[in-house]
């Protein structure tokens, strides 16, 4: 046929059997990739430290999606929360991966069968004897089946009625676990951070899908609508399907980047806005203040801060700090976190407590500035020492650590104080192992960043694909250059004057 590469899909345009075949093969490729990728990630994943080296620090991409749906155990004898298990059951990480690969193989065989046996009776229009598809009826079938799946997921899997539930955590990502979720039918169900909304929305959307599917199965479209929307053209199906996919991609890019109950920070890492707003820092200070109110010492109050909470309050876990084209996991960037050194408290020689200004997200370098409780600059690390007024040496800044590995340790040596002031710009201070993975010290993004970038990019491409194919199907006659009156115009004797539709002959 000699088709150019960008037109090869025309071979299935009027061939329902092989159109079905290539879609089954596509499903085989997707399921095969998912299963294979899961096995690869399981081969390189280290489950030993879920607090300082969680899945998102290691660059895991498919493991978080399995986990949020209720998979927590491995045939390797470990649990995602750090415990050991003896009976992981069939639906472990490996079990799910294996199921995808088996399903992929079955789809592969089915695709070959449908490619060979393409000329089936079911695809033939009995009136014309030619291959054709009843697209409105197929739309109704798909809508009904997807509605059943959607309803079933919300009513059974998420609620734990027949299934494990989903991953649910607290607002600070500390106590996450898989548990059943009750549907939220009130206004709170519209809060994107309320897990109950996942159950109720799936139940509601599934019910709507079932009813809409039954409607489209029992009611034929009006002729004008059928012709106006080109419902008999397979390219209409392609166009509207692309629209559904790009819309979904835009939505999930938003829920991933801005955060929601469907994208827990324990599985995908924190969002950039949690750093920008000092979200974890405020919670840490609230807990310390509560401890001091209970007559705890500063050291005791800081020692009770969970290491997990302190680790979230570190700029290296901000997905917007890694460049989009820096390959590798977060661990390949700043290293594997080993331990929290503690919270540094800086004071000048007058005993006034100073706070290091934190680095904003989109800065690579930032001046080291220490301010007091009123926001007045009291110390800095100057660019030009000759003009300095607030240098660490001049102001006499010291640092003391509370909580963590350096609890109770203080330093007055200016070089050491400046070192910790620079590190305090980046949030809580952690000891990082760069040797194991030969980490280069350049921040990387988390799976949250990759997912958002990928889905936003493809959504944009698919948006243009929708416009393209929608235009092609709506204006097919214009693009093809076929005028509906063309037959009459060139028919001998149709007009008194050849090609002039105003002189049409009247039949006697």
Curated annotation (Swiss-Prot):
GO terms (BP aspect): photosynthetic electron transport in photosystem II
Coiled-coil regions listed: none
Location within or outside the cell: Plastid, Chloroplast thylakoid membrane
Transmembrane segments: 21-36, 101-115, 140-156, 203-218, 237-252, 457-472
GO CC terms of this entry: chloroplast thylakoid membrane; photosystem II
Main function: One of the components of the core complex of photosystem II (PSII). It binds chlorophyll and helps catalyze the primary light-induced photochemical processes of PSII. PSII is a light-driven water:plastoquinone oxidoreductase, using light energy to abstract electrons from H(2)O, generating O(2) and a proton gradient subsequently used for ATP formation.
Descriptive protein name: Photosystem II CP47 reaction center protein
Organism this protein belongs to: Lepidium virginicum
Taxonomy of the source species: Eukaryota, Viridiplantae, Streptophyta, Embryophyta, Tracheophyta
Gene name of the record: psbB
